[in-house]
């Protein structure tokens, strides 16, 4: 969906084999069953997934989230945009999501809804494009259009100076947490998903600097209360500020978890490697250790990133000021080392399932930002083999194209 391509994983056998179905992506450029644009194709695809040993499916509902809760600006002169609108609305009205969830469960495959909580869109004049002839649709949630102040903002003192990070909300606001929980429930309550997977990725244009945004009024007020510093007018401890902002995301996860406990559904979260949220957001602390040790989450997916540099060449120069950046390997140990030393032991101790996306830890795109360019496939195969030997790793993804039939008539 929306230009974020399918995450590439590996076809090797792990303890569990999970499949990422980015529905809005697979409905384009494909034929036959793999297109998944009708309920019947979904049924046929699931039969193939079961036969090929898929244990869990993360089914992306973001296209339908946009359809229901956002204003979408569709250029009628671009066939791709017209087709997206037509297929998405028809699929929703014909109950494609309900079919997918129920058929998955009948097949003995766990069904998780994948929803993004950091991607509320932007006005048409703001959202990036791919260049001439490759325009991309723009969308913006009605909630953020009507409540612009809830978007994370910069350190400007006056409203006329203030800049916002389009699409990214500040979870310090109770109304933001309430809105997003209701958005999640629009799918998790309506359909019998086994769990909810929260994605921390975004199509939003990145900040000019990793610490540019995060100075909303609730954060300013709480920081002053705790530390006696006005972060709009005085110098302050950046690490304390980054940690405080991360606490609000943790609060949101606790609220989601509390609701899911009433429905018997599990909570999974996808993050980049490391202690910070990273590109294209900033240096907000990701309190994954607390999430695991307090069992706020049931499953942790490591390596789940936006890939702003490899996917979007027009944004390749924007990675600046990040303390940790998985895409560039900045400030991070090799993922194998982190899994053995940090993630694996802690997740095993507290009974939290640990999944890894190996395809996001080696370079298989040729982009100038990487200097040496793409790495050979052998690098990825070696990495997968190593990850499969690490205690505590529950599973890795299988590639969509490896388990889904692509032939047949439209």
Features from the language model and the residues they span:
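Active-site-adjacent "subsite" loops/lids of carbohydrate-active enzymes
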Residues: 16-39, 113-190, 365-376
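Short, acidic/polar
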Residues: 33-50, 176-187, 279-294, 373-389
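Catalytic domains of carbohydrate-active enzymes, especially glycoside hydrolases
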Residues: 40-67, 190-195, 296-302, 387-396
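Aromatic-lined carbohydrate-binding/catalytic grooves of carbohydrate-active enzymes
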Residues: 54-92, 209, 306-329
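Substrate-binding cleft of secreted/luminal carbohydrate-active enzymes
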Residues: 56, 296-315, 326-336, 342-345, ...
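Aromatic-lined carbohydrate-recognition surfaces of secreted/lumenal glycan-active proteins
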Residues: 110-122, 197-204, 240-284, 351-363
């Amino acid at each position: 969906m929306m230009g974020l391509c399918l995450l590439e994983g590996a076809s090797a056998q792990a303890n569990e084999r999970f499949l990422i179905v980015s529905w809005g992506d697979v409905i384009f450029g494909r034929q036959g069953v793999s297109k998944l644009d009708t309920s019947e194709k979904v049924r046929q695809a699931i039969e193939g997934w079961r036969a090929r040993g898929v244990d869990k499916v993360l089914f992306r509902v973001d296209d339908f989230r946009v359809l229901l809760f956002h204003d979408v600006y569709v250029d009628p002169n671009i066939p791709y945009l017209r087709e997206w609108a037509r297929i998405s609305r028809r699929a929703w009205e014909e109950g494609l999501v309900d079919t997918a969830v129920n058929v998955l469960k009948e097949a003995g495959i766990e069904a998780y809804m994948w929803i993004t909580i950091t991607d509320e869109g932007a006005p048409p004049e703001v959202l990036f494009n791919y260049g001439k002839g490759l325009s991309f649709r723009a969308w913006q949630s009605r909630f953020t259009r009507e409540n612009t102040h809830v978007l994370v903002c910069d350190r400007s003192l006056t409203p006329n100076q203030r800049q916002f990070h389009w699409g990214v909300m500040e979870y310090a606001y109770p109304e933001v947490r309430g809105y997003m929980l209701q958005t999640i429930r629009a799918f998790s309550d309506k359909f019998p998903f086994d769990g909810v997977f929260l994605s921390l990725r975004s199509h939003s244009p990145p900040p000019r600097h990793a610490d540019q945004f995060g100075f909303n009024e609730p954060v300013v007020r709480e920081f002053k209360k705790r530390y006696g510093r006005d972060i709009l007018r005085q110098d302050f401890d950046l690490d304390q500020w980054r940690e405080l902002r991360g606490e609000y995301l943790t609060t949101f996860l606790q609220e989601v978890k509390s609701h899911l406990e009433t429905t018997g559904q599990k909570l999974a979260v996808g993050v980049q490697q490391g202690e910070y949220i990273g590109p294209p957001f900033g240096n907000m602390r990701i309190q994954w250790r607390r999430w695991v040790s307090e069992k706020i989450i049931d499953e942790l997916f490591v390596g789940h990133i936006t890939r702003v540099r490899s996917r979007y060449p027009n944004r390749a120069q924007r990675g600046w000021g990040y303390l940790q950046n998985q895409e560039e390997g900045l400030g991070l140990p090799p993922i194998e080392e982190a899994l053995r030393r940090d993630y694996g032991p802690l997740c095993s101790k507290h009974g939290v399932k640990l999944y890894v996306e190996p395809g996001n830890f080696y370079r298989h795109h040729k982009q100038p930002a990487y200097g040496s360019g793409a790495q050979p496939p052998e690098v990825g195969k070696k990495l997968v083999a190593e990850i499969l030997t690490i205690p505590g790793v529950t599973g890795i993804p299988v590639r969509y194209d490896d388990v889904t039939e692509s032939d047949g008539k439209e």
